Amino acid sequence: MTHRRTKLFMMAAVVSYVMTSCGAVPINDLLDRASQRSDQLHSLSTTLSQELDSHFPPIGRVIMPRPSMCHTSALQTPNDKTQALQVSESELLSLARSLLQAWADPLSALSSSAFSLPHPAQSSIFNKVREMQEHSKNLGDGLDILSGKMGEAAQALSSLPFRGNDVGQDRISKLINFHFLLSCFRRDSHKIDSFLKVLRCRAANTQPEMC
């Protein structure tokens, strides 16, 4: 019993140290790290899309759902940098966190589907999806810390439920639905990256036209 209490005390001390250390990091540095991670995440999704394109059936481009069908499309977000610069810092962070959180289940669905995806680069695709999951989680943890420093508005989250766990049964359906889901993630990862870059720019007191 004494050993167990000692172990629990040590774990609590480690958690306390980590939280204190994170709390001591300036917002500018946290935004730099978050921006770097979001850039890596978007770059990875782009590379994965290109890899998937190498053996994507032509019919797939014709019947693939439109971007407006992405499960995150209901969230109203700035369409470009000019609009993003008009949104408050707290709201931008809230939007980035909402988008990222909305991809926890879809990324799991992509990971499960990639395990048996009918594609010559299946193994590479599977590994990249797992890597995206890891990057997404790490980024989410960082944004949670940031939101705690930026007030209640930054901590607000919009619910964007995902109901498409089954990507299909036949080869064509699997490839098309996988590609569609990945294209949605690539679009959203670009938004997240853009929002965080605007936040980083503002934190550095850079002139808006230079962001």
UniProtKB/Swiss-Prot annotation:
Disulfide bonds join C70-C184, C201-C211. Keywords: Disulfide bond, Hormone, Secreted, Signal. It comes from the Eukaryota. One of its GO terms (molecular function) is hormone activity. Gene3D superfamilies: 1.20.1250.10. InterPro entries: 4_helix_cytokine-like_core, Somatotropin/Prolactin, Somatotropin_CS. GO terms for cellular component: extracellular space. This is Prolactin. The lineage of its organism: Eukaryota, Metazoa, Chordata, Craniata, Vertebrata. The gene is prl.
